[in-house]
Amino acid sequence: MANQEIFDKLRDAIVNQNVAGTPELCKEALAAGVPALDIITKGLSVGMKIVGDKFEAAEIFLPQIMMSGKAMSNAMEVLTPELEKNKKEGEEAGLAITFVAEGDIHDIGHRLVTTMLGANGFQIVDLGVDVLNENVVEEAAKHKGEKVLLVGSALMTTSMLGQKDLMDRLNEEKLRDSVKCMFGGAPVSDKWIEEIGADATAENAAEAAKVALEVMK
């Protein structure tokens, strides 16, 4: 089976909420010699992007998102050990504090980005979902003086708006200059990042890892 055919099957498994079949497809792909990173970036993440777009367009709703998320989680259980094997050694890229915005419990992209950052040499502090901005600021303050990257995600426009409040709080607490700030999620755009004074965004988890490394140079 050609790699593109494998990637298409992985994409469709996520879009069609194939909870049981997705991890099996991942095992088959690994057995065929496809790298775990490619399975994620060229197959699963493509499916998640489609799911996110459909959700934004109100073509699917929360139950479908959750089922696609479960399929993704099951896939990552198979792939995370493979990513760990290939983890980049050497100097730590920095500390990534990852979280999902207050009012948002959609953690699919968040978990994927967190895994990818860990695989690319970042130490991880995962604050989880529905995180208050004051908790993010508090965590950032604990690590003042270190190389810190805040990585927040929001699937909904309403929760995305809290990212501006977070930037304001970081400025008020005089922490903004000591951290880099990166936000992602379906509604987040380059224009929004510029408007709130953050540092970066990314289209998907693999790109997020690359952008994060660039931002932390």
Swiss-Prot record:
Pathway: One-carbon metabolism; methanogenesis from methylamine. Residues 93-217 form the B12-binding domain. Methylcob(III)alamin binds at H106. Keywords: Cobalt, Metal-binding, Methanogenesis, Repeat. PROSITE patterns: B12_BINDING, B12_BINDING_NTER. GO terms for molecular function: cobalamin binding; cobalt ion binding; methionine synthase activity; monomethylamine methyltransferase activity. Belongs to the methylamine corrinoid protein family. This is Monomethylamine corrinoid protein 1. It comes from Methanosarcina barkeri. The lineage of its organism: Archaea, Methanobacteriati, Methanobacteriota, Stenosarchaea group, Methanomicrobia.
